[in-house]
From Swiss-Prot:
Known partners and oligomeric status: Heterotetramer of 2 PyrK and 2 PyrD type B subunits.
Cofactor: how and how many bound: Binds 1 FMN per subunit.
Entry protein name: Dihydroorotate dehydrogenase B (NAD(+)), catalytic subunit
GO CC list: cytoplasm
The organism of origin for this protein: Petrotoga mobilis (strain DSM 10674 / SJ95)
Length: 300
C-alpha cells in the first residue's frame, strides 16, 4: 500500500503535487480537465494589495526548451480575491496557498493581515518583486533585504508561511538560511529566471520591459541543483519548482530533497499535466516497491 501524503508546516497534502502560482489561475479554468480535489495543493495567481492590470505588449514568448512570460502580476487585488475567488477555492478538497506579492514591506504586511481572517491554508511570499524603497532591487536578491520582509511578515502572519526564492539571489543557500532564520516555515524554489529575447527584424526586445521570466524544462537542471543545495542547508520543508513536465522530473526533485513540487509551465502545454504527474508518481512508487515518499526524499 503506497502513501503519497506529505506534511508541510503542519498542513497535510494528499500528494506532493501543487499547481504553481500564475499557471493555474484560480482553478476554475481547469475543472473541465480534472477535479481540482485531485491536487495536493493549489498556489493562487500572484496577489497584490491592490488590483493590477499587468504589463502591456507581448506577455508570453516561446523559446527553446521553455517559455518566457511578462504578465506583470495581473490580479484583482486581495479584497476582490477574498470576496470573489476564495469561496470557490475553499469548496475544493485541496490545500489552498495564497501567493502574495508587494512592492513595499507594508504592502506585504497588510495583504497578509487580510488573509489571516480567511480560511486560506498557507501563504506563499513571492520575494522576487522589486522593492521600490531600495531603488527597485528585488527583495529576493540580497539576503538582508529578504530577511527584513520575512521578519516583518512573520510578526503578523497567523498562517504557515512559505517563502518563494528567486534564482537571482546572490547566494541561494545564504538566502534560504536567512529566510528560515527570519521565520519561514517552508521554502519554495525557484521562481522564474530573468531572461532576454530580441526580435532581430524589429531590432528591439520582444518584451516591453526588456527582460522576462524564463521557465520550463531548460531551467530544470539549475533549479534542481539549487533545491539540492538548499535542502542540505536548512531544516524546513522544501517545495521544488522548475521545469517539472512529468512524474520523472517530480521524483528527481524529491530525491534531491524536496518534500513537494510545484508544476507550472507544463499546465500551459497540457492542462492534464498535474493529474498525470500524480498518477505517474503513484505508479512509480508501486513499481519500485516504495511505500512512502520519505523513503526516497533527499537520497542524493
Amino acid at each position: 500500500m503506497i502513501d503519497t501524503k506529505v506534511n508541510i508546516a503542519g498542513v497535510e497534502f494528499k500528494n506532493p503535487v501543487i499547481a504553481a502560482s500564475g499557471t493555474f489561475g484560480f482553478g476554475r479554468e481547469f475543472l473541465e480537465y480534472f477535479p481540482i480535489s485531485k491536487l495536493g495543493g493549489l498556489a493562487t495567481k500572484g496577489l497584490t494589495l491592490r488590483e493590477r492590470e499587468g504589463n502591456k505588449g507581448v506577455r508570453i514568448h516561446e523559446t527553446i526548451g521553455g517559455i518566457m512570460n511578462s504578465i506583470g502580476l495581473q490580479n484583482p487585488g486581495i479584497d476582490a480575491f477574498i470576496e470573489e475567488e476564495l469561496p470557490f477555492l475553499n469548496s475544493q478538497d485541496t490545500v489552498i496557498i495564497a501567493n502574495v506579492s508587494g512592492n513595499t514591506i507594508d504592502e506585504y504586511v497588510i495583504s497578509v493581515e487580510k488573509l489571516n481572517q480567511t480560511d486560506i491554508d498557507m501563504i506563499e511570499l513571492n520575494i522576487s518583486c522589486p522593492n521600490v524603497k531600495e531603488g527597485g532591487i528585488s527583495f529576493g536578491t540580497k539576503a538582508e533585504i529578504a530577511s527584513n520582509v520575512v521578519t516583518q511578515v512573520r510578526k503578523v502572519c497567523q498562517k504557515p508561511l512559505i517563502v518563494k526564492l528567486s534564482p537571482s539571489a546572490e547566494n541561494i543557500v545564504e538566502m534560504a538560511e536567512s529566510c528560515v532564520e527570519a521565520g519561514a516555515d517552508a521554502l519554495s524554489l525557484v521562481n522564474t529566471f530573468p531572461a532576454l529575447a530580441i526580435d532581430i527584424s524589429k531590432k528591439k526586445a520582444i518584451f516591453d520591459n526588456i527582460t522576462a521570466g524564463l521557465s520550463g524544462p531548460c531551467i530544470k537542471p539549475i533549479a534542481l541543483r539549487m533545491v539540492y543545495e538548499v535542502s542540505k542547508a536548512v531544516d524546513v520543508p522544501i517545495i521544488g519548482i522548475g521545469g517539472i513536465m512529468d512524474y520523472r522530473d517530480a521524483i528527481e526533485y524529491i530525491m534531491a530533497g524536496a518534500w513537494a513540487v510545484q508544476v507550472g509551465t507544463a499546465n500551459f502545454i497540457n492542462p492534464n499535466a498535474c493529474a498525470e504527474i500524480i498518477e505517474g508518481i503513484e505508479e512509480y512508487l508501486q513499481k519500485e516497491g516504495i511505500s512512502t515518499l520519505e523513503e526516497i526524499r533527499g537520497i542524493i
